[in-house]
């Protein structure tokens, strides 16, 4: 059925769900490694703030998009209790869900209201009402599946290229990749952005 096919496509594109919840020490630093992945973060209570002064300050009960990270980042806790929940997508895993070019969003944190993505602040509020992590995951997956059904524009060559990259764990030379997807390198680069 459509839902099971949709979830299979969702699972291929996401890396993991994660939750940061607890009572950290005041001023505790959390280092974030650059991994090229993108995240949606739902603040389900107080949050850890970004150390960089020019960055967006995240507010409780909101949702945020974090673009592909290519440099280290640090979060600092200033609250007694923290609760953040997120979904991490593999590189290029969002091309079916967002209309913005991800290359322009590298190393940025923006409100999902500004990103035009599939999630919004009302989802963060609904996630707060879910008592268990599995319930939160089910709610997010229903949003993702619905988005796949409404945005059925599939770039088969790009989807195939992403699968090849993931299968080779990023070790496939570009020349081999463009030959596999039957595109010239320049056209491939334009489509991939």
Descriptions of predicted regions:
Residues 1-11:
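Single conserved hydrophobic/aromatic residue that forms the stacking wall/gate
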Residues 14:
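Short proline/glycine- and basic residue-enriched helix-capping loop/turn segments at helix->loop/beta transitions
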Residues 18-31, 66-72:
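Conserved short histidine dyad/triad with adjacent acidic residue
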Residues 27-38, 80-82:
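A short beta-loop-beta micro-motif enriched in histidine and acidic residues
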Residues 35-49, 91:
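Glycine- and acidic-residue-biased ligand/ion/polar-headgroup-sensing regions
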Residues 54-65:
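Short acidic-glycine-tyrosine-enriched beta hairpin
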Residues 72-172, 181:
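Compact structured core domains
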Residues 171, 175-193:
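Basic/polar phosphate-binding segments, predominantly the helix-turn-helix DNA-binding elements
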């Amino acid at each position: 059925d459509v839902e099971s096919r949709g979830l299979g496509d969702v699972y291929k594109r996401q890396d993991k769900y994660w939750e940061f919840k607890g009572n950290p020490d005041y001023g505790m630093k959390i280092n974030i490694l650059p991994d090229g992945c993108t995240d949606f973060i739902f603040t389900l209570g107080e949050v850890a703030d970004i150390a960089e002064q020019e960055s967006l300050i995240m507010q409780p009960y909101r949702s945020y998009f974090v673009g592909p990270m290519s440099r280290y980042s640090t979060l600092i806790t200033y609250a007694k209790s923290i609760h953040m929940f997120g979904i991490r997508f593999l590189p290029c895993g969002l091309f079916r869900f967002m209309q913005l070019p991800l290359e322009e969003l590298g190393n940025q944190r923006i409100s999902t209201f500004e990103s035009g993505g599939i999630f919004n602040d009302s989802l963060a509020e609904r996630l707060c009402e879910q008592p268990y992590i599995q319930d939160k995951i089910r709610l997010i997956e229903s949003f993702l599946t619905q988005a796949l059904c409404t945005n059925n524009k599939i770039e088969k060559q790009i989807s195939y290229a992403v699968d090849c990259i993931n299968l080779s764990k990023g070790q496939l030379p570009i020349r081999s990749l463009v030959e596999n997807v039957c595109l010239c390198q320049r056209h491939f680069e334009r489509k991939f952005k």
